[in-house]
C-alpha cells in the first residue's frame, strides 16, 4: 500500500528581539546533534554554502547573509538514502529543515524515523513551554510516503484502504483527537493530507501525513522539502505563517484576560466617582486623602491599559499579515484543497483571532478614554478642593499671626511692659517660638495629610511646646535647679506628644 516512507521536519525559530539568544542556542544545539545523532557529517555539494553558517551563529538573520535563496548552511549523511538538514533564512525567522528518507533496503518506517528525530531534540528541553520560552515559533513533522501501486491516486475517504494503512502506521500525537483519520483532504497537487496533531489551537508542534501517487516523488519533494533553488517549499512557507499565527495566540493567552483588566479599571473609576460625588468635590481631610489615593490607583491602571491596548493593536496587525500570507499561498490550503482539514482550520482560526483582537482593542481603547477623562476631571476637582483647603488654612493662619502682631504693636505703642519676672522671660520667649513653630507644622500637616513625616513633625512641635510651657510654669512657680527643669520639660514634652497623638487619631477616624 505505502512505500518510500520518509520524515520531514521544519523548525521555525524567531532570532530577533528578546528571544534571540535562546533561539540561537536551540538552533545551534539541534544543528550539532544532526551530526552527532543522525550522522550528518558532510556538507551538501553544489549548494554554495558550507556545513556551518558563514560568520557564525551570531551573524544572522542580518542582511549580509550569503547563500542561495536564503540558504545559510546544509549538511548530509553519506551513504544510501537522503539524510539531509538545511538552515534557511526567512526575514527574522530561521528555519531548520531536516529530511530523513532512508533507502528501501534500510527498512525504516515512520515510527523509527520519528524516534530518531525525537532523539535529536535537546534532552529535558523539548517541552512546549521550554521551546516557546526560547523563541521557537513552531515545529512541523511531515510523514511522507507514496503509494506502491502504479497509476493509483491517494484518496483520504474513510472507506478506502489507504486510511486504514495510514492510521496503523502513523505515530500520531498522543493528544490527537480520535477522529483524525476522518479529517483528511486532497490538495490540488493530488496529495492526500491528514493532520495528527493535538487539538489545542496554540499548539507548538504540528504533525501532518502526506501521501502522494507512486510517480509523484519530484512533486512531493518540491512541495514538502525543498525547491529546485534550495528554498523553503510551499508547504514549509505555509506552515511558517501558521506557526506565527499560533505563536501569537499563545502569547495572547499567556497574557491573561483583558476583561479582568477592564473590570479592574471600571471598579477604580466607580470608586473614584463615589469619592468625589459631593457637588464641590471632597471636603474633609480624610475624604480628600481617600480620593487622592483612588486617583493614584486609577492612574496606575491607566498605564496597564495603554500597554495592553497598544500590544493588542500590534498583535492584530501581525495576525492580519499572517492570514494574508496564508491566503496568498492558496486560500485555506497551500495549493488549494477541498474545504475542511488542517488548512481550513488555520484559516478559521486566523479569522476568529483577528476579530477577537480587534474587539479587544476597541474595548480597551474605550476603557482607556474613560479612564483618562475621569482621571483628568477628578485631578482638577482634587486640585480645586486642595486649593480651597489651603486658602482656608492660609486665612486662619494670617488672622492668627495678624492678631499677635497687632497685640505686640499695641503693647509697643502704648509702652506697656509685661510684668514678667526675670527667670520667666527666657521660658516665655521659648514658648512663643515653639507655638509659632507648631502652627507652621500644623499648616504643613493640613496641606500634606497623606505624608507620615508631617505627623511626626507635628508631634515634635507639640512636644517642644509642651516642654517650653512646663519650663515657663516652673519658672513662674519659683522652682529652681537644672534637674527639676529637665524633669518638668520632659513631662511637658510627653504631654504635648500625647495630645498631638490623640488629635491625630480622632482626625483619622473622621
Q: Which sequence ranges carry the predicted segments?
A:
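N-terminal pre-transmembrane cytosolic regions of membrane proteins
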Residues: 1-176, 433-440, 456, 505-508
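Serine/threonine-rich low-complexity intrinsically disordered regions
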Residues: 19, 159, 281-284, 345, ...
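Acidic, low-complexity intrinsically disordered regions
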Residues: 27, 53, 79, 106, ...
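N-terminal juxtamembrane/topogenic regions of multi-pass membrane proteins
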Residues: 29-32, 39, 173-179, 183, ...
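Amphipathic alpha-helical coiled-coil segments and their boundaries
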Residues: 238, 247, 284-287, 291-294, ...
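Membrane-associated alpha-helical segments
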Residues: 304-419
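Hydrophobic alpha-helical transmembrane segments and their immediately adjacent juxtamembrane loops
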Residues: 368-510
